[in-house]
Amino acid sequence: MENKDIRKILPHRYPFLLVDRIIEIEEGKKAVGIKNVTANEPFFQGHFPDNPIMPGVLIVEALAQVAGIAVMNIEEFKGKLGLFTGIDKCRFKKVVRPGDQLVLEVLIDSIKMGLVKAKGVAKVGDEVAATAELMFIMTEEG
């Protein structure tokens, strides 16, 4: 799934669309996305100018966007908005820098009454950069 297809599913846009493409998807069960981290990312201007590091919260947001794509492909949730309700067991294990390619893998644990629970792992190569358990609610509006 290319970026133009992602934009048909997610409401996010530059500079907050953090998924470049989806390389694997099982509707409602799993999705794997790619984020190519470039030196031109706007957050590197301040985080940190002489030592650019991708903010961990944006890695978690990228995982959430991949989870959203897995769920928003289900007919029942097409056109809905996913809003965070919780983040648990979040750990940052590797610094992510310009030039890195983040592989964002999300497994959907459950979907009940629009409440989605998922587990995400972000990797650079074979190294885990971040892990988190994500919860969000599918809604008509914010």
Swiss-Prot record:
It catalyses: a (3R)-hydroxyacyl-[ACP] = a (2E)-enoyl-[ACP] + H2O. Pfam families: FabA (PF07977). GO terms for cellular component: cytoplasm; membrane. Keywords: Cytoplasm, Lipid A biosynthesis, Lipid biosynthesis, Lipid metabolism, Lyase. GO terms for biological process: fatty acid biosynthetic process; lipid A biosynthetic process. GO terms for molecular function: (3R)-hydroxyacyl-[acyl-carrier-protein] dehydratase activity. The keyword Membrane does not apply. The active site is at H47. The keyword Lipid biosynthesis applies. It is found in: Cytoplasm. Its main location: cytoplasm. Its EC number is 4.2.1.59. InterPro entries: FabA_FabZ, FabZ, HotDog_dom_sf. It comes from the Bacteria. NCBIfam families: fabZ, PRK00006.1. Involved in unsaturated fatty acids biosynthesis. Catalyzes the dehydration of short chain beta-hydroxyacyl-ACPs and long chain saturated and unsaturated beta-hydroxyacyl-ACPs. Belongs to the thioester dehydratase family. FabZ subfamily. This is 3-hydroxyacyl-[acyl-carrier-protein] dehydratase FabZ. It comes from Thermoanaerobacter pseudethanolicus (strain ATCC 33223 / 39E) (Clostridium thermohydrosulfuricum). The lineage of its organism: Bacteria, Bacillati, Bacillota, Clostridia, Thermoanaerobacterales.
